[in-house]
Amino acid sequence: MFKLLSFANAPAIVRANQKDSYFESRLHNQLLDVVKAIKGSHFVHKYPEELRTLATALYLCLTTLVGSKTLGEEYVDLVYVSRDGRKIPKFASRFGFVVAYVLFPYAVRQLLQKLKAQQSRLAQLVSGVSYMNVMDLLNLHLALFYFTGKYYQFAKRLFGLRYAFGYRVDKNQQRARGNYELLGLLIIFQTVFKNVANLRKLWGATKTVQDSGDLIYRFRDQTSDVIDLADPKVLPYLPEASRTCMLCLSPMKDPSCGECGHVFCWKCVLDWVKERQECPLCRAKMRESQLLPLR
């Protein structure tokens, strides 16, 4: 197809998407009624996300995948064109868009839920960071759309599906964007301010840990004598079997313990806690600020 049609602008694409969201919601409700009649309410409450994903897949498979317009596209009179606007997208591009738009978000949500269900610190960190990064990227992509009018969904950008008006428009109508550029600026400012606030919180938490460590270091520097348990006269209340550090396997120097009560060399346990905030023996939580030198 030659480039005869004008690319659609942001207001028209947003109106089409709003209409599609409305009809997709109605299809979802009708699907729930059918499934509830067949499988019962328990099944519907057990798989709400899967049923919503199925409704979206049905809507797009009955329209975009087979080359027909969605109801929102019919309402605004939009057609799909290639990136350069000269061709109609092939079936492979439409199929890729449907799969990416429907299944990829579902797969990501399932993965994040599994990571969150795991109690390991790494799993919680990855799930939290991944969710924040994905949301920030989607917000920035939406802001880019408000500025350019291209690719409302990221999946359409990935497979090169652009919208064009199904009729000829004058230049004034084509340039009309309303206040969408202002919305794009607001989204960018919101994302930046949110991340700056998160960085400040992270910096504050790191600073607190560093300050706690500095206080402990200054405390140790102020004590001139090193407490060496190789001398049985030093801290005689400690039994012989408990005077060896389990980290360096030598008699303890400057013995220190955490809230769990296990005792180690000051330098050994401090180096350990900097890498892993847990007791080397019982895995109880242990931080620099919680270490207590024994006297």
Swiss-Prot record:
Give the ZnF (RING-type) ranges. 245-283
Its assembly, as annotated, is: Component of the PEX2-PEX10-PEX12 retrotranslocation channel, composed of PEX2, PEX10 and PEX12.
Q: What does this protein do?
A: E3 ubiquitin-protein ligase component of a retrotranslocation channel required for peroxisome organization by mediating export of the PEX5 receptor from peroxisomes to the cytosol, thereby promoting PEX5 recycling. The retrotranslocation channel is composed of PEX2, PEX10 and PEX12; each subunit contributing transmembrane segments that coassemble into an open channel that specifically allows the passage of PEX5 through the peroxisomal membrane. PEX10 also regulates PEX5 recycling by acting as a E3 ubiquitin-protein ligase.
The similarity annotation says: Belongs to the pex2/pex10/pex12 family.
Sequence ranges on the Peroxisomal matrix membrane side: 1-9, 63-108, 149-179
Q: What is this protein called?
A: Peroxisome biogenesis factor 10
Superkingdom of the source species: Eukaryota
Q: Where in the cell is it found?
A: Peroxisome membrane
**One function term, GO molecular function aspect:** transferase activity
State the encoding gene: PEX10
